[in-house]
Amino acid sequence: MRKLSRRQKENRAKTKDSIYSNLEDAITILQETATAKFTETVELHANLNIDPKYADQQLRTTVTLPHGIGKTINIAVLTNDSNFTEAREAGADRVGSDDLIEEISQGNISFDLLIATPDMMPKLAKLGRVLGPKGLMPSPKSGTVSTTLTATLSEFKKGKFEYKADKAGVVHVSFGKSNFTHSQLMENLTALYKSIEQNRPSGVKGKYFKSLFICTTMGPSIQLDLNIFL
């Protein structure tokens, strides 16, 4: 087991055996323990009472946080050439048709998000094995299959992103950076929690949230009381 540094031991001591019922206090500790020499990503880990192997217990949706997550993403658009100008003017970083499909098939993926128009989806189907594991396959549910490229690109450029529960029913998602203000992190986390809550799968029975933790890239896990947002 890797030996903990003095800083890590001190940070863990601050959160050991604590469950925070006050959001302001939790965010304060979160920022106090973000002591790495780089700007750390801030994450929520929500353990949900779901079994994603059942279709009615799957969680996959999009959200736009009030203050973004502090990340600029590269967006590629797959469409026919009649839409190239619109996509470029709307801010797409890469626009293509069959040429883009060929690049992807060769493993040349230089984008963080892929948006496609419906007419291109049959051609894209063969790349499911390449894009699927990376979470890059466009889908109507995530808003990445669209006929309104200008509006869709605007939303994602403003910080809209997709998140989903993993096979164990846990959502791992960023809600900002350690250099965000206290209020920005509080507002982002609250908005993210509400999004997860509002998209509760229809097949969930009983309690939805099992546990909630927040942390920074190098910081300790901070457990939140399940009633903290009430």
UniProtKB/Swiss-Prot annotation:
Primary site of residence: plastid
Superkingdom, natural source: Eukaryota
Keyword RNA-binding in annotation: yes
Pfam families: Ribosomal_L1 (PF00687)
InterPro entries assigned to the protein according to its UniProt record, in alphabetical order: Ribosom_uL1_bac-type, Ribosomal_uL1, Ribosomal_uL1-like, Ribosomal_uL1/biogenesis, Ribosomal_uL1_3-a/b-sand, Ribosomal_uL1_CS
Keywords: Chloroplast, Plastid, Ribonucleoprotein, Ribosomal protein, RNA-binding, rRNA-binding
GO cellular component, one term: large ribosomal subunit
CDD domains associated with the record: Ribosomal_L1 (cd00403)
Quaternary assembly: Part of the 50S ribosomal subunit.
Similarity remark: Belongs to the universal ribosomal protein uL1 family.
Function: Binds directly to 23S rRNA. Might be involved in E site tRNA release (Potential).
The name this protein goes by in its record: Large ribosomal subunit protein uL1c
Biological source species: Trieres chinensis
Biological classification of the source: Eukaryota, Sar, Stramenopiles, Ochrophyta, Bacillariophyta
